[in-house]
UniProtKB/Swiss-Prot annotation:
InterPro entries referenced in this protein's UniProt entry, alphabetically: DLC_sf (IPR037177), Dynein_light_1/2_CS (IPR019763), Dynein_light_chain_typ-1/2 (IPR001372)
Sequence similarity: Belongs to the dynein light chain family.
Protein's name in the database: Probable dynein light chain
Taxon lineage: Eukaryota, Metazoa, Spiralia, Lophotrochozoa, Platyhelminthes
Domain of life of the native organism: Eukaryota
Protein role: Acts as a non-catalytic accessory component of a dynein complex.
Keywords assigned by UniProt, alphabetized: Cytoplasm, Cytoskeleton, Dynein, Microtubule, Motor protein
């Protein structure tokens, strides 16, 4: 795994969970090339660690407007991709 620096653009999430999100995203990028598979991996890991219902969007070009549970939202960049991870429902 090469040097990676995440740029957190917006977060309503405890710092330890933010770190887990970035590390999980890095692991997903190591394991998968297709963005849908990267998103599925992150979503499943967060469902397992922090209980359902997590939603994850990964890509280079997308807009979003979501409702999320308090303290369960992060939007960041890693390796030229945007990651939107939030819990709702």
């Amino acid at each position: 795994m090469g040097e990676r620096k995440a740029v957190i653009k917006n977060a309503d999430m405890h710092e330890d969970m933010q770190e887990t999100a970035v590390h999980t995203a890095a692991a997903a990028l190591d394991k998968y090339e297709i963005e849908k598979d990267v998103a599925a991996y992150i979503k499943k890991e967060f469902d397992r660690k922090y209980n359902p219902n997590w939603h994850c969007i990964v890509g280079k070009h997308f807009g979003s407007y979501v409702t999320h549970e308090t303290q369960h939202f992060i939007y960041f960049y890693l390796q030229e991709r945007a990651f939107l991870l939030f819990k709702s429902g």
